[in-house]
């Protein structure tokens, strides 16, 4: 009994251990055993375990092909992702999980298919009643093709059914179709065609995947019984209106197109409406009009002829048969049709040159605007008016001219009496310049006339001039210089266009030699007033300019008044003064010398050592004069037999060892431009005493001192006066005695 219990206990222990192990480590796979995946979709295979903290996973196909997917393991779960699913994913996949020494494995079969779109219904052409047409039902991109079945229904009636079991399956996507030919009838309108495709993916599953397309039948009938109605009539007058209506039968309802048959048989499309209305009919509107009914399966047409009868009309053109237009202005040519409601206009030049203007048509009037007018616009213009089948033309001649500005007078320089001058009369921007005449007049006298007719004209604006040289005189002042320009027209105007410019002549006369008045005298005494007055004749009146001539010959301007005044003259005012008369015609000048004289009280006659000397003494007689230019000093000794001029040095005369015969009257004469002055003194020479050998020492010393001091004093006085007084004269020169 105990042995049996032990055996039972041991067996139960082993079973418990096995049960515990089986509970501790399990593997599961999802989806289970088998799954379907559509090509292009995403597929997840999940392998998970229980009873193991850190299992390891591995995936493989049963035939060891590539997985063609991505594996992601997290803890006790591993996922194989196939994105997108392709043919390479059709396998049996095995997931192996290992936990320590234990290993478990699960497998799953992945089958793939492709059935992504609804079938398509295609027709070989439009469904026209009574005409056979082929309809095709297509199932695109299918796999496996051997499990496909296609059915085609018209309404509830099965037209055809087809499967593809006999076709060899391929590892590829295929498009299969079912084709049926049938003849549409009127009763098919609004019926539906149904194309149904079935894919039996799992042979054990009797329910297939199914897709279908439904298309309502659009049945057509070709247009027929096309008819035209015309109101009011097919025969019309110019300016009248007509309405034509067209109708046609067919399915779908035909579109109506109106055309006109041209002379060459070509149809000119006019309208896409059932009703065609023509207003203000013209002659050219006559003809055959065609109505055509058109739909997808056919067309039907009919025609009608309209006859439009003409009526007379005239054309007027303004402003006339000829018009003159200035360059830069605007001119409007107007062409009007009378008796035609809807005329058509065209403009051209007689030489078929380009039109440079703007054409505007409004009703029965057409205008051609030339703005701005240029020389290229000079043409004969033709306006052609078409009224139905009739044409009329009118011509207008446009003459272009340019004469925008008055002439310009240019003179080569100022007008000076007796001096030749060139006058230029310019006429700017003239056209046509070969019709230009230029005349130059002085007062009422024609100086020169020129007609440019002989020059070759060009199609451009040109500037022309007339030039001449004449010598103006003083008598021309106040006269008018006139430049007269005339532009002659060819035929349009009897009188030429005129422009003129006038310039009053003012002839300049150069200043004559000035006249100078000096009051009271050109040699006044120092301190007295002096007025220098100048005048000069000329035109315009000369301006007066007083200047002083410097030692270097240059002129120092002093005044622009006619009178130059000195209130109190000074010695330095002496000099040459120049008066200039100045105007635009020239300069004239004259000079005068002003000499300022010193007063006579400055003359002194002295003797050294005294007027009474002894025989043998040295005597110095001196004559001096201050602040007097141009002075002559003459020392003389009066005698009964005649005056004896003494040879003086700087106004001094020295008697060495005076003798009794040296006694007498000595005279100093000073001469200037205004007169002379005299000074005199008497020298007394006494004879020696008995002791002839006696010579006083004091007298000897005095003699030597005087011989040195007196010349020194004279030199000092000379240089001082020369330095302080401008214009003073050296007494050295005064020794040149004048008798």
Swiss-Prot record:
Keywords: Cell adhesion, Cell membrane, Disulfide bond, Glycoprotein, Host-virus interaction, Immunoglobulin domain, Membrane, Repeat, Secreted, Signal, Transmembrane, Transmembrane helix, Ubl conjugation. Residues 1-24 form the signal peptide. One of its GO terms (biological process) is leukocyte tethering or rolling. Glycans are attached at residues 273, 424, 531, 561, 650. Residues 721-739 are cytoplasmic. The chain crosses the membrane at residues 699-720. Disulfide bonds join 47-95, 52-99, 137-195, 246-291, 335-383, 534-579. Cleaved by the metalloproteinase ADAM17 to generate the soluble form. Expressed in aortic endothelial cells, with low expression in the descending thoracic aorta and the outer curvature of the aortic arch, where pulsatory shear stress exists, and high in the inner curvature of the aortic arch, where oscillatory shear stress prevails (at protein level). Expressed on inflamed vascular endothelium, as well as on macrophage-like and dendritic cell types in both normal and inflamed tissue. GO terms for cellular component: alpha9-beta1 integrin-vascular cell adhesion molecule-1 complex; apical part of cell; apical plasma membrane; cell periphery; cell surface; early endosome; endoplasmic reticulum; external side of plasma membrane. Cell adhesion glycoprotein predominantly expressed on the surface of endothelial cells that plays an important role in immune surveillance and inflammation. Acts as a major regulator of leukocyte adhesion to the endothelium through interaction with different types of integrins. During inflammatory responses, binds ligands on the surface of activated endothelial cells to initiate the activation of calcium channels and the plasma membrane-associated small GTPase RAC1 leading to leukocyte transendothelial migration. This is Vascular cell adhesion protein 1.
